UniProtKB/Swiss-Prot annotation:
WD repeat feature ranges: 106-147, 149-187, 191-230, 233-272, 275-334, 337-378, 401-434
Physiological role: Positively regulates the activity of the minus-end directed microtubule motor protein dynein. May enhance dynein-mediated microtubule sliding by targeting dynein to the microtubule plus end. Required for nuclear migration during vegetative growth as well as development. Required for retrograde early endosome (EE) transport from the hyphal tip. Required for localization of dynein to the mitotic spindle poles. Recruits additional proteins to the dynein complex at SPBs.
Coiled coil ranges: 57-83
Protein's organism: Coprinopsis cinerea (strain Okayama-7 / 130 / ATCC MYA-4618 / FGSC 9003) (Inky cap fungus)
Designated name of the protein: Nuclear distribution protein PAC1
Subunit structure: Self-associates. Interacts with NDL1 and dynein.
One GO biological process term: establishment of mitotic spindle orientation
Taxonomic lineage: Eukaryota, Fungi, Dikarya, Basidiomycota, Agaricomycotina
Residue ranges annotated for the LisH domain, each copy included: 8-40
Length: 434
């Protein structure tokens, strides 16, 4: 089964025909034309003209680059082997630093959100220009634009297999796009009475959860598009929402300056976290890998609990990032350093660090065990509105990795993908690679 779309197949065939025609391979040209069953007319302005030569040149250039990198790697390994300490940072500890590997341009208004595909080198971006764009983050190449929303697209998320992409917009709609069917818009969800600020797939991918300026959080069934329940409690615009990895808890942040925790099964509030002094823009549950470092920071024993959702990070317009114990509702640490609104958060896969992006144009890296800011990355020329760390599961689905909602001891670990993406009001996306 070919992985190429019909359009990609057509372009490939025409590129091959173009090459054969240009080099007077008449017999092969006629044979391919008949076999492929396509109409071909030489056109020097067509996108497939000279494409094979360009791709071949790119492959040679990449092979040369690979050889150079392999030689460089061998030299570095030799240096390490001769070093007494041999304490160079491992790939597991990689952190982004300037300059960015790729700068992706094409959006015509500020970026609002970005999401990595869980299996392939695909990145989706949302913008105030009403579109979603699909990119190859490894090469930095643009792939396609998804049109359907009529107002700014505020957030997006892939399901755990990467088959579906969900988006939400100020046009009040939530849409699902099928990556296996030419990225067609296959479902539309209605129910919110104002701009939809955030959307996420719930673990299991059967439900989605959304947050809105109408002050509510809503849960929808993916298959039927029906609304399952409404969660009410915030007194102002709900800016963000995210489920815990096992789906037993939701966290939301609001213009009312609070973070709230919810039971998604009943819709009942569990607790309210107060401490921010302005709109809460971002929330992120800490992965289990971060528990030891956060407990060290909090000065509490590390009991090796594997339950999800025990700790939470929040970022707000008060320029701070806060770490919370969701069981007690207590704030563990206030991370201050940004000079403007904090817009997005991402935990490092190792669990050692937390990354935050801000309207001060930077990304900051916080060491969780000490609360110190280890690095400041001058990321963009304008506000950094979106931040994401690459995700890639290694073989097993989420349901196969858990027993009664808890990580199995025998679960295969997720593959760490060292790539970070940032999106900005400067209308660009930057890809940060080792």
């Amino acid at each position: 089964m070919s992985l190429l779309s019909d359009r990609q197949k057509d372009d490939l065939h025409k590129a091959m025909l173009d090459y054969l025609y240009a080099n007077n391979h008449t017999a092969a040209f006629n044979a391919l034309k008949e076999s492929a069953g396509i109409t071909y007319t030489p056109d020097p302005t067509a996108r497939y003209t000279g494409l094979l030569e360009k791709k071949w040149t790119s492959v040679i250039r990449l092979q040369k680059k690979i050889m150079e990198l392999e030689n460089r790697n061998a030299a570095l390994q030799e240096e390490l082997s001769m070093s007494p300490a041999r304490r160079a940072a491992s790939q597991a500890d990689w952190l982004p630093r300037a300059p960015a590997a790729h700068v992706l341009t094409g959006h015509r208004a500020p970026l609002t959100s970005i999401a990595f595909h869980p299996q392939y080198s695909i990145l989706a971006s949302a913008s105030e220009d009403t579109t979603v764009k699909i990119w190859d983050w490894e090469t930095g190449e643009f792939e396609r634009t998804l049109k359907g929303h009529t107002k700014p697209v505020n957030d997006l998320d892939f399901d755990h297999k990467g088959h579906l992409l969900v988006t939400c917009s100020s046009d009040l709609f939530i849409k699902i796009w099928d990556s296996q069917n030419e990225w067609k818009n296959t479902k539309t969800f209605v129910g919110h009475d104002h701009a939809v600020s955030a959307v996420r797939f719930m673990p299991g991918d059967q439900l989605i959860v959304s947050a809105s300026r109408d002050r509510t959080i809503r849960v929808f069934d993916v298959a039927s598009t029906h609304q399952v329940r409404t969660l009410s409690g915030h007194s102002e615009w709900v800016r963000c929402v995210i489920p815990s990895a096992d789906g037993t808890m939701l966290a939301s942040g609001s213009k009312d300056q609070t973070v709230r925790l919810w039971d998604p099964l009943t819709g009942e509030p569990k607790s309210e976290l107060r401490g921010h002094e302005n709109d809460v823009e971002a929330v992120a549950f800490a992965p289990i890998s971060a528990y030891a470092a956060i407990r060290e920071l909090a000065g509490i024993p590390n009991d090796r609990t594997k339950r999800h959702g025990l700790f939470l990070a929040s970022g707000a317009r008060d320029k701070t990032v806060k770490l919370w114990d969701t069981q007690t509702g207590q704030m563990i640490r206030n991370l201050a350093g940004h000079d403007n609104w904090v817009r997005a958060l991402a935990f490092h896969p190792s669990g050692k660090y937390l990354l935050s992006s801000s309207d001060d144009k930077t990304v900051r890296v916080w060491e969780l065990s000490t609360g110190r800011c280890l690095r400041i990355v001058e990321a963009h020329s304008h506000f950094v509105a979106a931040l994401a760390w690459g995700r890639q599961a290694a073989g097993k689905s989420g349901s196969e990795k858990k027993v009664n909602g808890v990580d199995s001891v025998d679960a295969e670990p997720e593959k760490v993908v060292n790539v970070v993406a940032t999106g900005s009001v400067d209308e660009t996306i930057k890809i940060w690679l080792p």
